[in-house]
Each structure stands twice: as C-alpha cells, then as structure tokens.
C-alpha cells in the first residue's frame, strides 16, 4: 500500500491503518482511480454537477464520481466514460465493488475499450486483464467483491501494465529517471528544512530529497527498495515502481570482506569491486571496496542482483558497529529503553526484517540500532552460539570478549552487567 500512499491513491481508514481485509465501495474505488490518474486537483470543479440521482450533493465522493463519469477514454474510433452507472440513472456509490467492475474501470484508465475486450462483459474484460498482467497475484471471480488489499494489488499491477497504445503506464506519468533508484530514507526534511515528508533517493538531479506530488512521504515499506522513480516537471515524486531484480536481505555474521559477505547461517555472497554500496545517511553511493569496512557483524543489508551478480547493496544504518550505538533488550522494551540511542525522540519507527513492528513486538535479547536519518529503530535477532574464552579488561567487567575460533567482539554497554556473570569455557549465545 505504500506505493499507492506515495502517489496519494490511498490514505488509510483512520488511525494510520490501511485495513487490507476491509471491503471497498464503488465510490471509494472511483476515488482511488481519479487519484491514480493524478486528476485529484480537478475534482472540486465537478462538485456541483448532478450526473447520478443517488450521488447527491451531500455524498462525500460526489466530485470524484462526477469527474470519473465525465472522463472519456479510448481512441478515435470508440470513446467511453471511465465509469458508468447501473442503467437506471443510479451509480450505487456505496455498494461493494466487484472484481469485474474494478478490472473494467482500470482497463479503461489504461485506454482499453470493447474493441480489445470484446462485447461479452465481464468475461472479455477479465480475459484482457489477465493477458496484460493486471490481475496477477489476485484470486477472485468476476462477480466477487474485492478487499482493499486486492484493490491495492490491482493498482500496483496497473503501474507496470502496457496501455492500449503499447506504452508501460508509469512511463507516461512523468519523467522516469534513467538510472534505477534506491529509496534511502523516507519522511525526511527537504534540503532547506522548510517541510517534512520528503523521500531521499540515490538518483538525484537538483535536490537530495523529493516531496511527493500528491501523496505521503511516510512510506517505510519502500525504504531500501530499488526501482524506477518518476518525477513531474516540478521535480516532485509521481510514483516509485520497484524493479524485478532479485532482492535478498541478510544479517551479517561477521565483518564484511573486500570480496564477500557471510550471512547468518553461513551462506556467503560474492561482491565485485564495482558493486555499489548505499546507506540511508548518504546521497551518493560508494564502490564496495571503498565502503565495505563500514559493515560489521550484526549489520542488516539488502543486496540487489541482476543476471546472477550483486549490483547494489543497501544498508539502513550505514556504519553499524557493535558499540554504545546499540542496545540489547533485556526485558520489555519501552521508549525509555532507547533514550540513549534516540536522544529522547519518541516518534520513531520500528523495523525488523524489513517489516514495521511495534515496541511490544521487540523480544528479550534483540539488538537494536538507531538510524537517525530515517528516525528508525532497526531490530536484529541474530544469534551466534560459541564458547567464551577470554575477556578484556577483566572477566567481571568485560568490554571485549574472545570466543572459540579466535574471533573478538565488543560488548555493548547495555550488556556489560550481564556478561560479567559468565566465565571462560561457558557456552554462550
């Protein structure tokens, strides 16, 4: 849903919830389509018109329904309204929308008509939707009502579908940056500090951070993703479309090496000297050989591959180190637990394995670092079992320990007290 939130297509149902299992009315879907077409600024001009008898002046979606009904799509041979009523002058705005209706509306938004779909409705439109990838990943019959999550998937699919003219839809929404982009941080301040809600990316023309044209820049699910960024003529974000390269997220079991990294579980990944490394705190990437030393054991990275080769790496916290910039959670976590990391900030986001979680979902012994740029707590549950061998400066108050295999680890300040209870020869995790 964050792709659509960035575009202004959705905004949740209140309390910052998207409610993916909730149903969707015809009026709600119509509003989403208008926003998807980036026509929301035109809606107020249609508020005084009466097109459907049951979409009265008091209806919340009147302007959007009227705009959609007045928007003609198709080609020179056939023009159809984006939406139509039920045949008796009514629109039934509060009835739940079906899969067939939703697919038909989006196909029309892409410029298709009965010339391509045929005269049999809804099956002709459903077949056409399937052939262009519009219904990929959605299991619903033509007459089945759809959930908000299914509707969101339709819109996300539509971004990458070809329109009736053979052009990929998102490419016609604005200027597509020539290089694939990684979203480094979200909901950040603009360069001049005049506004918040910008998105910082790896591909910048005139600024480090872009504001969305219509939507919300607080899109944590997109942070660290790589894809195509589309801007309007004001250098505002119209949309972001993740690409189809393979993305693999791992936690490092040891320090990164000049030509490789090893993940928890022992799997090793090869890095080329020209593999690019990006962090949330930088606007430009580094070649792997120039930046790999910033990645220590416990760092979480996302690797992007093309044709079997890792071409880019993203690290949410950049210079993740095992020092006082991290906290081991020993009991129930509260905002106060991380006061030393955040400097007292309490409006942070919490992420674990690329998923947003709550403080109550952080478990004892989880390790938490803080990404100041993104105002995000990054949670890791990496566990390594080994034999404790020695400690410095003393076993009772260790700041550094050595374990079997000759490896050394710094001890977090928050774990000093608990580590003092162990002695050489103990098996520890």
Question: Which residues fall in each region the model found?
Answer:
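Feature responds to low-complexity, polar/acidic, surface-exposed segments characteristic
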Residues: 1, 11-66, 70-101, 106-145, ...
């Amino acid at each position: 849903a964050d792709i659509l939130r960035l575009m202004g297509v959705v905004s949740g149902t209140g309390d910052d919830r998207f409610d993916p299992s909730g149903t969707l009315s015809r009026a709600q879907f119509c509003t989403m389509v208008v926003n998807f077409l980036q026509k929301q600024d035109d809606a107020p001009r249609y508020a005084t018109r009466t097109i459907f008898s049951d979409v009265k002046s008091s209806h919340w979606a009147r302007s959007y329904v009227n705009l959609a009904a007045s928007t003609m799509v198709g080609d020179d041979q056939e023009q159809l309204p984006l939406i139509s009523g039920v045949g008796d002058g009514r629109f039934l705005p509060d009835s739940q929308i079906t899969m067939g209706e939703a697919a038909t509306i989006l196909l029309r938004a892409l410029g298709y008509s009965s010339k391509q779909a045929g005269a049999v409705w809804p099956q002709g439109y459903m077949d056409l939707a399937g052939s262009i990838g519009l219904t990929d990943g959605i299991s619903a019959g033509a007459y089945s009502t759809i959930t908000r999550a299914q509707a969101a998937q339709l819109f996300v699919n539509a971004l990458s579908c070809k329109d009736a003219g053979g052009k990929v839809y998102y490419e016609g929404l604005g200027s597509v940056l020539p290089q694939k982009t990684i979203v480094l941080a979200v909901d950040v301040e603009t360069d001049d500090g005049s506004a918040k809600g910008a998105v910082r990316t790896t591909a910048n023309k005139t600024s480090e951070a872009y504001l969305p044209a219509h939507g919300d820049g607080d899109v944590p699910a997109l942070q660290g993703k790589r894809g195509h960024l589309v801007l309007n003529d004001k250098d505002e974000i119209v949309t972001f479309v993740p690409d189809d390269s393979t993305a693999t997220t791992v936690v490092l079991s040891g320090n990164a090496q000049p030509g490789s990294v090893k993940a928890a579980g022992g799997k090793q990944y090869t890095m080329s000297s020209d593999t690019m490394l990006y962090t949330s705190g930088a606007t430009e990437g580094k070649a792997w050989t120039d930046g790999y030393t910033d990645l220590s054991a416990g760092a979480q990275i996302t690797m992007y591959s093309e044709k079997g080769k890792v071409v880019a790496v993203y690290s949410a916290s950049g210079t993740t180190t095992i020092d006082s910039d991290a906290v081991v959670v020993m009991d129930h976590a509260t905002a106060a637990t991380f006061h030393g990391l955040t400097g007292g900030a309490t409006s942070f986001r919490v992420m674990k394995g690329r998923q947003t979680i709550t403080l109550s979902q952080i478990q004892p012994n989880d390790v938490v670092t803080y990404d100041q740029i993104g105002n995000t707590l990054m949670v890791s549950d990496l566990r390594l079992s080994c034999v404790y061998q020695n400690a410095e400066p003393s076993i009772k108050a260790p700041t550094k320990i050595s374990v079997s295999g000759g490896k050394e680890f710094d001890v977090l300040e928050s774990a000093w007290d608990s580590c003092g209870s162990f002695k050489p020869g103990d098996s520890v995790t």
